[in-house]
Amino acid sequence: MATVLITGTSKGIGLHTALAFARAGHKVLATMRNPARAQELAERASAEKLPILISAMDVDSDHSVRDGMTTIEKEHGAIDILVNNAGVEASGSIEELPLETFRSVMETNYFGALRCMKAILPQMRQRRSGCIINISSVAGKISSAPLSPYMASKWALEAVSEALAGEMKTFNVRVAIVEPGIIDTSMARRIEDPGAVSPYRQKTRFSHLFVASLKNPVSPSVVAEKILEIAEGDIWTLRHPVGPDAAPFLQWRAQFTDEEWVNLNAGDDDAWYARVERDFGLDTRPKSTAA
């Protein structure tokens, strides 16, 4: 049995990951910014009599992470597995979004994960044992409007995770990156709504891609099972695309030169919708204009 700390467990991937590890017999320390939002997790853990302990930890706060880690280690011993799942999204054009939005997303998605890793690395290094799993996204390998704040944060997380993997392999600590595609979470469904009218057509187009993909939703439990598999597995691999569209999205981007990719995303709506339909079999056109 391992002791597992998971951030961002109030819903979605984090909640399902907490349940998956607990069902597998591990002790789960489920953290979130506001434990008042833990009702679903608490009820499911209680109903199944699962070893899940819920506590407050705000990954945006040095004080919260430091004190949380100290308390956990005193009460539960060393942490064997860290799953950095806490994350937020924001969509919009770079011109229209306030700078504070970029800072806020980066604070949670990148610095939040980094903060937790730095807090736990000394004990893992000294014990020469441990596993860190960072939840990124296919967005960590693809960049396109209108998700620049989110994508920038995931690119940063991918970079620091790859660097950390090289540093910690010497100490027998595994680092892995999970790259989900479009998963049925509240975060994904928020991106469905293009919101206010914008001169940037990409904002509306991307929302329609999410609408089309979520017609056949992929449960967060699929990602949770992959995270558990990585943690319990003997064979180490750095990156793990998850979900039926994850690898295809990455392969789609890889087939374009940088200039071709920019031109596609800067092009007119008809060309963009046609290319997505050709390559993915998805009609992402808005219903009012679909053929």
Feature-to-residue mapping (PLM):
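Substrate-binding pocket helix/loop in short-chain dehydrogenase/reductase
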Residues: 93-94, 101-103
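Active-site helix of classical SDR
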Residues: 117, 153
